[in-house]
Amino acid sequence: MKREVEILAPAGSWECLEAAVCAGADAIYIGGSRFGARAHADNLNEERMLEAIDYVHLHGRKLYMTVNTLLKEQELGELVDYLRPYYEQGLDAVIVQDIGAMRLIREAFPDLPLHVSTQATVTQTLSAQLFQRMGAERIVPARELSLEEIKNMKNATGLEIECFVHGALCYCYSGQCLMSSMIGGRSGNRGECAQPCRLPYRVENRKSADLMSLKDLCTIDMIPELVEAGIDSFKIEGRMKQPDYVYTVTQMYRKYIDIYLQKGKKGFHVTKEDKEKLENCYRRRGYCDGYYRKQNGKEMLSFEASRKRDGTEERKKWITYYRKKIDGTLNLAEGTVSELTVWLHDRPEMTVTVTGDMVQTAKKSTPCGRTDRKADTENRKYPVCI
């Protein structure tokens, strides 16, 4: 097949950015210091973001910046100045939720591509056409659409279509959740979702369970269907994930999209070993195929506790086999750089030293912790392994 399909990988840090590039992503989406829907990610400051734009361009890739929160009145006046240095550096696109922000960006930067965020809740063709008239070049439809609905939107508008293919799913409609704001005072539409849907809840006369927590999305087996539906960009969720997750998932989708584009359906088959690699990389509560084939299916829900995996079985076996006792010293003296040195208990000549920030005395007025909550440490162990 001659059609090109973009792999769009997440980056919540510089390390994740490098991992995405190395794994074969065509483009990376990342948040800056403001206006992004992942306020608690290790977002880049202005200097590092400018470096990131140059870095991906040197590797022949693209960088999309998230401006996907709802802006307040006073923030609109700051948005143009915030984006200007990135625009001048060659930023490839901005992903936007707020309609007012879209209009402002289009007026200030007429040739900067606008991508409509999934947070804008584009659920049908008329909405897509509205954004098209506003100058959008790409739509990220609401996650709740079926493949047939996505195909119709593509055919009716001719816009680029970007869809999530892997990662976490929200219980509520994209961009319409107020639960975090109501329960915890942290709005998902301001980049501070506390993920209350991941918590256990108790229904009357029943045991507590994770009643609103969806399984993670995985569409590696559906690549032929997604391509044929007209999806232009395969988006991987995970700006809060670690570099090894970004690398592994991006690499897998790169591999199998290329296989399908080169060999078609007859040559397309995802091996059991590669599926296991995806599962071992990160799996919250099992996988599902989202809303693409069946809407509102109860099989999307998991009532079990989270089963996050943070490494391969081989890595776990290696850690178990090589677990050794270590000794160490931590030097903290005011006005000096903090320094930690560790060594093997039975081989003191094998040492590692790392340094950190300058040590400062804490002010009395600075709260250093909370006394109204107790950490559950009785059943937890935190071994240090070399």
PLM regions with names:
Residues R38-H57, G191:
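Glycine-rich, positively charged N-terminal anion/phosphate-binding segment
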Residues M1-C22, A27-I30, R34, H59-T69, ...:
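Surface-exposed amphipathic alpha-helical tracts and adjacent flexible/coil segments at the periphery
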Residues A120:
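Conserved catalytic-core segments of large NTP-driven translation/proteostasis enzymes
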Residues G100-A101:
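Alpha-helix capping/helix-boundary segments
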